[in-house]
Amino acid sequence: MPITPFHIIAGFAVKSIFNKHFSWSIFALTNIIIDVEVIYYIFTIGEASHKFFHTLIGSSIIAFSCAIIGIPICERALKFWNNNLQNEKSLAKLKWLSTESDISVVSSFTGAFVGAYSHILLDSFMHFDVKPFEPFFSKTFVGIISIDSLHLSLVGLFIFGLIVYLFRKFR
């Protein structure tokens, strides 16, 4: 499934621990951009195909690009998000969802590269055609962990991240 939410929610645990040093919005952007290739193949050949962007070389190029280009894009999106939460028509109960809109270069690169490498690692457990180390060798990790166990682990990471986030936000 392209742009699976499981990739993105797993990053929430990293964000909750490394708050200022990790951009979750850049992490999410990187995950989405990596799957643009899969969406392209769905529309052109009629099936999901994981190719160049799902290798270390391809995902590194995407991560570097997202780390640079993503800062102004994500900062603008976060400012829009925060402004809408501060809107007088917004429910006061939702204002706690506002977040820091400034993204440092360090947090951008951390979010982008953790996003890219975790994406191809997770996909290599689920899809036979993901070979992260190509063109050097064609190793896949399918079967090491069941997809159900993988999904449960990612949901568990999200719940852990949510607990840490809420604890830090309201202490």
Segments from the language model and where they lie:
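N-terminal membrane-targeting hydrophobic helices
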Residues: M1-R171
